[in-house]
From Swiss-Prot:
Alphabetical keyword list: ATP-binding, Kinase, Nucleotide-binding, Transferase
Biological source species: Clostridium perfringens (strain SM101 / Type A)
Keyword ATP-binding: yes
Name this protein carries in UniProt: Protein-arginine kinase
Gene3D superfamilies: Glutamine synthetase/guanido kinase, catalytic domain (3.30.590.10)
Gene of this entry: mcsB
Amino acid sequence: MVQWISPLDNSIVIASKVKILRNIKGIKFTKILNEDEFNDLLSMVLGCFKEIDILDKCYVVKLKDGEEKIIDYYKENFGLIKYFENKDNLIFLMNKNGEFNILLNEEEHIGIECTNSGLSLREVYSKIDNLDDLIEEKIHYSFDSELGYLTSNIKNLGTALRAKVFIHLPLLSSNNLIKIIKNALKEEGITLRSIYNSGNKDVGNIYEVSNIKTLGMSEKDILDSLISITNKLILREKNQRDNLSKDEYIKLKDDILRALGILRNTYSIDRDEALKYLSYVRLGVELGIIEDLTLKSVNSAMIEIQPDMINNSSIKKIDIQSLKIERAKIIRNTLNT
């Protein structure tokens, strides 16, 4: 079980994720490595991981060996893996305890990422930083005293740190405040985007808050900024909830319980409709309106109903109608237990 799925409380914040990117001194960037150079890189890095006792703690997945289905599974895990520019030579190390993931030859030579529940950016970064220090004792990174960590993508230059918070903002979304907030945050070097989309429309009310800048700020500055912004978003969402009129609250409660009834009894449902109703159900749990469910159940449902997840559990790829039926079955089983 991935750790973030089990939250500590009924938090608006679902999970925090940190990823750092590193390149090895004296080796070409990932995009221009040939096969022999990649094998040399792999031998060096895996040898290092064995020395510092990482390798035995991980499952090692090689995409070139035809294990794309396993990667599809993680693509649905709130974007644990998103970009595969070098699919043939991508190596994925998944910690057996779900504490961290390491990607070799993805965006850069090494990518280390960790996700945990709630607003826990500092704790997540601490885990990654400790692991990074162990690796750096054995491998010399590409580093410049003025520019910081050197990367093939200029957007990652500097700290080469990407921090993200996944947050549930149904009231801000329904009151059409998200677009205004997105534009304001962009001015502060922060991106706010929906993790689920249908065309140009946000779906599911789950948003990713992430840093844009990696250069000219320390790791601490980046994390502190993101935590501060997230706390402001939490406060704004709570204010929307607290300031509902009596009639608005009654309607919201009715919408929440209707959504729960539909999901517990549906036979066939598409992804967007399911995410819409699951957002209502999650809100119901957060507000204490729904007492016989946990956020763990809702989080699990949101992940398990994604197309790649359903296909991953099937022997062969299933058609759209069968996908809808299987999705409804997953939701019924998850929300009725």
